């Protein structure tokens, strides 16, 4: 939102911005979550000229699909963040290059030879790109993917807890580094590791992605990739302005991380 507002002020635009957000993922009470998600039924889209959609934190796939279908029905231009969808304009960071750099850093500077990619949803746009970069590096290093697996789950903290708990309970050999698809999963792994007597980064290393506040203030501090959210917000406004001006806009656009 900060990036959106910055671009609006920079261009001195007369734009009214309305934000609809929910905390439907935060409770295990299904009825509570339904109530939270009801906020998406409030907007009268006939009063709007465009939509910026970020549903990366909506873990309920049926709810996510419901929102997407509703936006399709409006006929409005939609700029979607990290979501490939027919007729939407997708804006994304470079999910590929930073993982390549991170993997080489861990391999060359920290002598890591056993890896685990602690991923999110298998079909999520960002997760697919980051997992593909990870796989490329594993092959480049001459390692076997079955010995350096890719794990799939959600994008949340509890997924990281689950990954670590499974390693402990199944007495699996721990990797030199958990390459996490985001900082939430990294934090979950670190917390569960500490509960089981492990010390990060002494016993193994954990990396994140997104550069959330928790990466900076978490102990141990998590090595992470900076996701420039403000630039994404700024780019969303630029795309909508070009659409409103009748310009041709590519289906996908990228912002450097």
For the regions a language model picked out, list residue spans one by one.
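Alpha-helical recognition/docking segments in bacterial nutrient-uptake
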Residues: 1-104, 169, 173
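Short helix-capping segments at alpha-helix termini
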Residues: 10-13, 138-145, 170-173, 195-200
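Hinge/beta->alpha junction and helix N-cap segments in small-molecule ligand-binding domains
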Residues: 18-35, 55-59, 90-101, 117-165, ...
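Conserved acidic residues
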Residues: 49-50, 113, 176-177
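Glycosyltransferases and closely related glycan-assembly transferases
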Residues: 65-76, 136, 189-198
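Glycine-rich phosphate/diphosphate-binding loops that line cofactor/substrate pockets in enzymes
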Residues: 103-115
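Flexible loop/turn connectors
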Residues: 163-257
